[in-house]
Design a protein with these regions (language model features):
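Right-handed parallel beta-helix/beta-solenoid
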Residues: 6-46, 62-64, 87
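Short, well-ordered beta-to-alpha junction loops that form the rim of enzyme active sites
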Residues: 61-64, 222-223, 255-257
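Short, flexible helix-coil linker/hinge segments at the edges of structured domains or between repeats
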Residues: 178-185, 272, 276-281
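Loop/turn elements at helix/coil->beta-strand transitions in domains of secreted/extracellular proteins
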Residues: 17-19, 53-57
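Extracellular beta-strand repeat scaffolds in secreted/surface proteins
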Residues: 56-60, 85
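Right-handed parallel beta-helix
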Residues: 81, 85-90, 110-121, 157-173, ...
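Extracellular beta-strand-rich solenoid/capping regions of secreted or surface-exposed proteins
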Residues: 45, 49-54, 65-83, 92-160, ...
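Short, small-residue-biased leader/transition segments that mark boundaries at the very start
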Residues: 1-5
Length: 292
C-alpha cells in the first residue's frame, strides 16, 4: 500500500470531462496522463488534485491497495455522472483511510456512482511525529469520528443521485483520547449540515450489494442536521437493497429526517455487537426516527 499523499503535493488540474482515468499503485506513475491501463496514475494525492466533470470515470486496479483518503471533486450531470469503478481481475481495490476521518469523502457533489471498492479505516489519527492527519487541511480529523464513506452537504441547494453499488466496508473505528468515543465508527454516512439555517436535502440515494461489517457504531447513517426542519426538507427517494450488515456495534441502518425510503432484501446479523471492545454494543437491525 502507498504512503499518504495529499493533493497539496500536486498541481491542481481540471478534467475536460468524458475521460477515463486509471490508478495503479503497483505499476502507476503520477507523471503519466492516467488515461490508459498502460499509463496509470499511482497515488491518491494525484487524483485528489483533479476536479472532475460530467462523464469522467476513475478506475482503481483490482488487487491493489492505497493508504490515505480519496476526496472526489466536481459533479456529474443527470445524463453523465462521474463514476468510480475498478478494472482488471482480482479482489476489490482497497482504500485504507489510514486514520483520516474518511477513506472516501464526497462533499457538495451530485450525480456520482461508486462501485467495486473495499474501504477500511482504523489506524491512528496521528502521524508518527505526532501531527494530526487532516483532510485538505480542514478541521476534520479521525480522532473522535471515523467513516468508510462520508457524503456531506452544507450550504444552499439540494443534492441529487448518489449511487453506491458492490462496496465492502469493514473495521471502522476512531482513535480517541476519551474511550467513551471508541465506538464512533460508521460504514457510510450521508449528512446535511445546518449552515446559518440554510436548508437542503438529498434527493435520490441508491445503495445496493453492500457488505458492511465490524463498525464501531452504525453500518449506514443518513441524517439531516437541520434544527426544526420540516418534512419538506427531509432526505427522500432512498433505496437500500440486497445488502448485508454483520457485527455492527450499533444498528445496521439508521435513518433520521428521511421520507420515501425502501429497504429490501437485506440481511442483518449481530447488530449491536460487543465482540470488539470499541463497539457500542447496543442497536437494532434498522432504526428510523423523525421520518415519514
Amino acid at each position: 500500500a502507498s504512503d499518504v499523499y495529499k493533493r497539496q503535493d500536486y498541481t491542481s488540474t481540471t478534467s475536460p470531462g468524458d475521460t477515463t482515468y486509471y490508478v495503479s499503485f503497483n505499476s502507476g506513475n503520477d507523471e503519466n496522463d492516467g488515461k490508459s491501463e498502460d499509463k496509470p496514475f499511482k497515488n491518491l494525492g494525484k487524483i485528489n488534485s483533479i476536479t472532475f466533470n460530467p462523464g469522467d470515470i476513475i478506475k482503481f486496479k483490482s488487487g491493489e491497495s492505497w493508504k490515505g483518503y480519496f476526496k472526489l471533486r466536481g459533479s456529474g450531470s443527470e445524463d453523465k455522472p462521474i463514476s468510480i469503478e475498478n478494472y482488471s481481475s482480482g479482489n476489490k481495490p482497497i482504500i485504507d483511510g489510514d486514520g483520516y476521518q474518511a477513506a472516501v469523502f464526497i462533499e457538495n457533489m451530485e450525480y456520482v456512482n461508486i462501485s467495486g471498492l473495499e474501504l477500511t479505516n482504523q489506524a491512528s489519527h496521528k502521524f508518527t511525529n505526532g501531527s494530526v492527519k487532516l483532510m485538505d487541511q480542514s478541521s476534520r480529523t479521525g480522532l473522535d469520528l471515523r467513516f468508510g464513506l462520508l457524503v456531506l452537504r452544507h450550504g444552499s441547494g439540494n443534492i441529487r443521485n448518489i449511487n453506491i453499488n458492490d462496496i465492502k466496508i469493514s473495521d471502522i473505528y476512531p482513535t480517541p483520547n476519551n474511550s467513551d468515543n471508541n465506538h464512533q465508527g460508521y460504514g457510510i454516512r450521508f449528512e446535511s449540515l445546518n449552515d446559518d439555517n440554510v436548508l437542503n436535502y438529498y434527493n435520490g440515494i441508491q445503495m445496493e450489494n453492500l457488505d458492511i461489517l465490524n463498525t464501531g457504531h452504525y453500518g449506514i447513517h443518513i441524517v439531516n442536521r437541520m434544527s426544526g426542519a420540516q418534512a419538506d426538507y427531509y432526505h427522500r427517494n432512498i433505496v437500500i437493497k440486497n445488502s448485508k450488515f454483520t457485527d455492527n456495534g450499533g444498528s445496521g441502518i439508521v435513518l433520521a429526517r428521511c421520507k420515501d425510503v425502501v429497504v429490501e432484501n437485506s440481511e442483518f446479523k449481530g447488530s449491536g455487537s460487543g465482540k470488539d471492545s470499541r463497539m457500542w454494543n447496543r442497536g437494532s437491525s434498522l432504526w428510523t426516527y423523525t421520518c415519514n
